[in-house]
Structures are given as structure tokens and as C-alpha cells.
Regions:
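Domain-length cofactor-binding catalytic modules of enzymes
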Residues: 2-29, 37-41, 50-56, 65-68, ...
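Glycine-rich phosphate/pyrophosphate-binding loop regions near the starts of catalytic domains
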Residues: 59-60
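N-terminal cap/recognition module
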Residues: 64-85
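Compact, glycine/acidic-enriched structural inserts
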Residues: 78-117
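Active-site- or binding-pocket-proximal scaffold segments within functional domains
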Residues: 122
Length: 397
């Protein structure tokens, strides 16, 4: 579908979804954001739903300002995927050992490594910029510096919620490795600190929604946030890179005889800020549950733990600020999913997938998400499909 413009907004809100299908609270969030004087436009992706801080599946383009609550607490959350030389025929009939080996190599939930991972020992890890990255830790907010040891030990860990690690097959039978994670606790600590700082500023006292508090260009507060934001985004990138290196090491050991090779890793943020230029304006573009889909940009759009995912290539549609959806999008809250579905439902909806099927992940059941095929179809003018994947192993935190 092409986009529709939402009526009654202060600036253009272009929506790649049927407005009638979007919750009223999410529509109100979008209209509230449109009232900010720095806003130049909003794009809304087909996986749109109500979110904390700002609407998930929204792209917020501002000039001279940024809203830290819109970025959210998982700064730099995103996806990584890599195609391997393995095929479905190489996989064992019982995939439980493979799942167990992944869980042993990569801490999940609140877990962390006993010692910081040495990236120099990991297969294919891009060490460029690693030392400089950690050298900048001394320049981030004093309020979180005491978390350095935890930050080093959580580097290369999954977390919980909708974060996952998967073995997938594409339609040709090739095996892909895929994972989803962000900046872990250090990102949350930085986000919480700066959201609190923004809400104290005088120019944010009369907002329609206190979550819309912004930092303004050329102020010390904006400079501090940008520094910490971009550092946390880099943390998330390295976190996924280390996990992918650990994942690849598991695969190489488990399939020694196959002498596995890997294509270049595809990686993309979907909760972040980027400096981009549109219509002659330098803008700060916040993608809150959206990926960059500039012309030729590769991206990853996952479904749920029992449905397909897609590797896509951006078409460079500037009406969407070169963006696309970050996933299928929730059709109900976590609490609603827990009330509606049982572990039996989870078992039925994840048949054929080696994964957890207990009450702790019922809120991640496929039925709690929108149909991924519909979401992809609604953004045919934003991305083209490169590969469709279906998971056979899924590790959740």
C-alpha cells in the first residue's frame, strides 16, 4: 500500500497502515508528538502500536531537538543476521543440543559473562574501533560510571523480553543465524538518567505529555545526551557483533566436518537516532521501532518466535524518511497475551521450533503479534524482499 495522511495533525503524519486499525491511544500519541515545534514530519510503519515514551513503529524527524523518551530505554536495539554455507540437510533431527550449546555460550535474561569477552578471540569480530569505544566510557554521564564492570560483562549477552537468537532456514534451504538485542543495562541506565534530566528543563514544563520532553540544540544538556546516546548505540552494535561471533563459534564447533563459511553480517538498529538530511534540512531522525531503508540498505524484519522473518533491501522512499518497519508489531499487550493464551497454545503455535514453551514466554506467543506477511505487504514501496526465513531453533531470555 501507499501511505495515508492522518488528518488533524500539526505536521504531516504519513501512515503505512490503516488508521482505523491503530489503537486510539497510539493515534493520540502520534498527534501529541506532532504538536512539538521542532517536528518536521512523522512516518508511521505498518507494525505501529502504542509504546512507552512514543509510538512503536514511528519515525520522528526533528530539527534542532531530540526526545530521549521517544528513543526509549533500549538504545540501539536492533538485529543481526548472517547466511551460512550450511543447509537444512546438515542439521540433526534433534535440535535440542544446538539450542543448549547456544544458551551455554551466550548468557540470556539478566545473565552476564563471568569475565569480559575478548573480541580478538572471536571468529570474524570487527575489532576496528573497539579500543576507542571503551576509551570514551570516561566521557559518559557520571551517574552511570559505576556500572562499567557490569557493562563489560554484559557485552555479548542477550537480555530478555522479545530479544532472541535463532537458527533459520530460507526458502532455498540455506541456514541463517539471526539475533535481536540492544544496549543492555548500561543503555537503560543512560536513557533513564537523560529522560529525567530532560523532564526537569524549564521549556518542558507545559507539555501535553511529559514523555515529550526534549533536549534542544546548542545546549550542554543536548551535547551530553548526544554523546551518551551515540556511545550506547555503538555499545548495542558491538554487543550484537560479539554475540554473533560467539554464535558462529558454536556453529563451527558443532559442524566441524562441514567447514562452515559465513557471508557478511547484516546488522541494523531499530531504536536509535541518526543525523540525516531531507528537503534541504539537517534533521535528527528518531526511529522508534523502525529500520533505515535507504536505497540499497539491507535490513531485517522479524516476525515472532513461530513465524517467518524477512531480509529486505531498502527502496529509499523519502516520504518515510527512508524507513521501514522493525518487525510484525504487537497486536496486544504482554499482559493481555498472558491472560488470553496458555502454554498449550504456545506449544501449538511453535510446532516445529526448538524453543522454550513454558509460561515465562507466553507473552511472546505468535498470536500476540500481527501477521508478518501483512506487515511486509503494506510496505512494498519501502522495501523489497531479499529472503524469507523460518526459524527452527529459537533461544529466548
Amino acid at each position: 500500500m501507499s501511505y495515508v495522511e492522518v488528518p488533524g495533525a500539526k505536521v504531516p503524519i504519513r501512515m503505512w497502515a490503516d488508521p482505523a486499525s491503530v489503537e486510539d491511544v497510539a493515534m493520540q500519541q502520534l498527534r501529541n508528538v506532532s504538536t512539538l515545534p521542532w517536528i518536521k514530519g512523522l512516518a508511521v510503519m505498518p507494525d505501529v502500536h502504542f509504546g512507552k515514551g512514543a509510538t512503536v513503529g514511528s519515525v520522528i524527524a526533528m530539527q534542532g531537538a531530540v526526545c530521549p523518551a521517544a528513543v526509549g530505554v533500549d538504545i540501539g536495539c536492533g538485529m543481526s543476521a548472517v547466511k551460512t554455507s550450511l543447509t537444512a540437510n546438515d542439521l540433526p533431527g534433534d535440535l535440542s543440543r544446538l539450542r543448549s550449546k547456544i544458551e551455554q555460550a551466550i548468557p540470556v535474561g539478566r545473565g552476564m559473562h563471568g569475565d569480559a569477552v575478548d573480541p580478538g578471540k572471536l571468529y570474524g569480530f570487527p575489532t576496528s574501533g573497539w579500543d576507542d569505544f571503551w576509551g570514551r566510557f570516561g566521557g559518559i554521564a557520571d551517574a552511570v560510571k559505576f556500572r562499567q564492570e557490569r557493562a563489560t560483562k554484559q557485552m555479548g549477552t542477550l537480555g530478555s523480553g522479545n530479544h532472541f537468537i535463532e537458527f533459520c532456514l530460507d526458502e532455498t534451504g540455506s541456514v541463517w543465524l539471526m539475533l535481536h538485542s540492544g544496549s543492555r543495562n548500561i543503555g537503560k541506565e543512560l536513557a533513564d538518567f537523560h529522560i529525567g534530566q530532560a523532564q526537569k528543563l524549564p521549556h518542558n514544563q507545559d507539555l501535553i505529555d511529559r514523555d515529550l520532553a526534549v533536549f534542544i540544540a546548542d545546549t550542554p544538556q543536548m551535547a551530553a545526551y548526544r554523546n551518551d546516546l551515540f556511545w550506547a548505540q555503538e555499545y548495542a552494535k558491538f554487543n550484537r557483533a560479539i554475540m554473533m561471533g560467539l554464535f558462529q563459534d558454536v556453529v563451527r564447533k558443532e559442524f566441524k566436518k562441514a567447514r562452515v563459511t559465513f557471508d557478511p553480517v547484516i546488522s541494523c538498529h531499530h531504536n536509535y537516532v541518526a543525523e540525516e538530511r531531507y528537503e534541504g534540512m539537517d534533521l535528527l531522525v528518531t526511529r522508534k521501532g523502525a529500520i533505515r531503508a535507504g536505497s540499497g540498505d539491507y535490513g531485517i524484519i522479524p516476525g515472532s518466535m513461530g513465524t517467518g522473518s524477512y531480509i529486505v533491501k531498502g527502496l529509499g522512499n523519502e516520504k518515510s524518511f527512508n524507513s521501514a518497519s522493525h518487525g510484525a508489531g504487537r497486536r496486544m499487550s504482554r499482559n493481555a497475551a498472558k491472560m488470553r493464551f496458555s502454554t498449550k497454545d504456545l506449544e501449538e503455535q511453535t510446532q516445529g521450533v526448538e524453543c522454550r514453551k513454558d509460561s515465562g514466554v507466553v507473552d511472546e506467543i505468535p498470536g500476540a503479534y500481527k501477521p508478518i506477511e501483512q506487515v511486509i505487504d503494506q510496505q512494498r514501496d519501502l522495501v523489497q524482499v531479499v529472503a524469507k526465513l523460518k526459524q527452527v531453533v529459537c533461544v529466548k531470555g
